[in-house]
UniProtKB/Swiss-Prot annotation:
One of the protein's GO biological processes: amino acid metabolic process
Function: Catalyzes the formation of pyridoxal 5'-phosphate from ribose 5-phosphate (RBP), glyceraldehyde 3-phosphate (G3P) and ammonia. The ammonia is provided by the PdxT subunit. Can also use ribulose 5-phosphate and dihydroxyacetone phosphate as substrates, resulting from enzyme-catalyzed isomerization of RBP and G3P, respectively.
PANTHER family per the UniProt record, alphabetical: PYRIDOXAL 5'-PHOSPHATE SYNTHASE SUBUNIT SNZ1-RELATED (PTHR31829:SF0)
Matching SUPFAM superfamilies: Ribulose-phoshate binding barrel
Record-linked InterPro entries: Aldolase_TIM (IPR013785), PdxS/SNZ (IPR001852), PdxS/SNZ_N (IPR033755), RibuloseP-bd_barrel (IPR011060)
Protein name per Swiss-Prot or TrEMBL: Pyridoxal 5'-phosphate synthase subunit PdxS
CDD domains to which the protein is assigned, alphabetical: pdxS
Enzyme Commission number(s): 4.3.3.6
Residue sites binding D-glyceraldehyde 3-phosphate per the record: 166
Matching Gene3D superfamilies: Aldolase class I (3.20.20.70)
Biological source species: Thermotoga petrophila (strain ATCC BAA-488 / DSM 13995 / JCM 10881 / RKU-1)
Oligomer status and interactors: In the presence of PdxT, forms a dodecamer of heterodimers.
Residues bound to D-ribose 5-phosphate: 25, 154, 215, 236-237
Encoding gene (name): pdxS
Similarity comment: Belongs to the PdxS/SNZ family.
């Protein structure tokens, strides 16, 4: 147990290195190089960005090994890759391949409708999505070393990411004011281990890095998520579905760095070209955020 705990501490320490940065979805070596040159702290290797997964439908699986290896060989920054929720075999394959981080992601079609992966059994660290404190702490209990909002990926609409971040921050604030017996009852209510709730109370935040993700499409969106308390930002379709990906990628990185400086944000937001076209979340047939439990 102590070995696993120590490993988790190392894993979450690795995730701390991403704080204040942008992690970008890429589908080719060329895109990965653009992301690295723009200042991304890591890239997420994918076969299709979330907007295309949403548009094309079908079963979305782990990217091909050839695709991931191509991206790993193209850049010197960490490379992440997604696996389906509960798909232990995909995760073992990616660990053997040598990716730096695995995202057990609701963007892909879930493989198990009852269980998430036991992430303690892996040496490679995992990031998982969450809509609230209960989901976040369940994933951390399973061994996640990093959390991100689920938002609504592939929409270019930040409203759901905002909702999830605000909800989580409000719940954390409530926890900091609770007595221990209240923590026990609250843990039962939200399905979270009381030991982790005690840690949240002590820290006044999640015990792991908490990024924003899902619908971030403009530098202003990225800055907004930082204002709401995010430690950094994942950008999926927002960069390479924009009119000028190079400019947009650089602008996203600068917006996360200077999120609290309106003068710089104004300058960043000028001459970046058209952002990706957004979708109204209320009109969606498939809500990826509802995948997972």
């Amino acid at each position: 147990m102590e070995i696993k705990k120590g490993t988790w501490i190392i894993k979450k320490g690795f995730a701390e290195m991403f704080k204040g940065g942008v992690i970008m979805d890429v589908t080719s070596a060329e895109q990965a190089k653009i992301a690295e040159e723009a200042g991304a702290v890591a890239v997420m290797a994918l076969e299709r960005v979330p907007a295309d997964i949403r548009k094309e439908g079908g079963v979305a699986r782990m990217a091909s090994i050839a695709k991931i290896r191509e991206i790993m060989e193209a850049v010197s920054i960490p490379v992440m890759a997604k696996v389906r929720i509960g798909h232990i075999a995909e995760a073992k394959i990616l660990e053997e391949l040598g990716v730096d981080f695995i995202d057990e992601s609701e963007v892909l079609t879930p493989a198990d409708d009852r269980f998430h992966i036991n992430k303690h059994e892996f040496k490679v660290p995992f990031v998982c999505g969450a809509r609230d404190l209960g989901e976040a702490l369940r994933r951390i209990a399973e061994g996640a070393a990093m959390i991100r909002t689920k938002g609504e990926a592939g929409t270019g609409n930040v409203v759901e990411a905002v909702k999830h971040m605000r909800r989580m921050m409000e719940q954390i604030k409530q926890v900091t004011k609770m007595e221990d017996e209240e923590l026990v009852a609250y843990g039962k209510e939200i399905g979270a281990p009381v030991e982790l709730l005690r840690e949240v109370k002590r820290l006044g935040r999640l015990p792991v890095v908490n990024f924003a993700a899902g619908g971030v499409a403009t530098p202003a969106d990225a800055a907004l998520m930082m204002m709401l308390g995010a430690d950094g930002v994942f950008v999926g379709s927002g960069i390479f579905k924009s009119k000028d990906p190079r400019k947009m990628a650089k602008a996203m990185v600068l917006a996360v760095t200077y999120w609290d400086n309106p003068r710089i944000l104004l300058k960043i937001s000028e001459d970046i070209g058209e952002p990706m076209r957004g979708l109204d979340v209320e009109e969606l047939e498939v809500r990826m955020q509802e995948r997972g439990w």
